[in-house]
Amino acid sequence: MMRFMFLVASLLLCAAAFGAEPVVQLNSATVAPREIEDNTEKAVVRDYTRAWQSLAIALSENNSAALANDFVGQAQDELQQRVSAQQKSGLHTRYIDHGHNVQAVFYSQDGSAMQLRDTARLEVQMLDGDKVIHSDQFTQNYLVVMTAGDARWKVRVLQALPAK
């Protein structure tokens, strides 16, 4: 029985680290020059959530193909380079996502692009095989540009901002 309880607890911890959706809260009250439609706001939250899940999978499994559906342009290029560097070093990164407070800053007149500011609470673990060699919990601010395309929003820019 104890062995079974340990297995269940281990599975729950893994699900929390890898499978759980990050919580993304979007505030669009001050966006300019136009308001965000309700359906668009829901789509942005859904797709930004998926992007963070894809990022976590790509860096955990050292698999840049996981980025293809959610990232384009600069963000995709930079993350692919990071995956490549990890592959060369033999390390991988585990993201444990504790949520995102996202502020919509700009929504283009034609509805094709949106700028966001994200305050993300993250735990990042560097692993060599199964061994954690470094772990850090922090809050990171990001400048994000998302563009519409193929019936979904994709992250074009994901730039970490320096601490104030």
Predicted features along the sequence, with ranges:
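Exposed beta-sheet edge and beta->alpha loop/turn motif
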Residues: 111-164
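Positively charged n-region of N-terminal signal peptides that target proteins for export
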Residues: 1-5
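Short, low-complexity N-terminal intrinsically disordered segments enriched in polar/charged residues
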Residues: 19-73
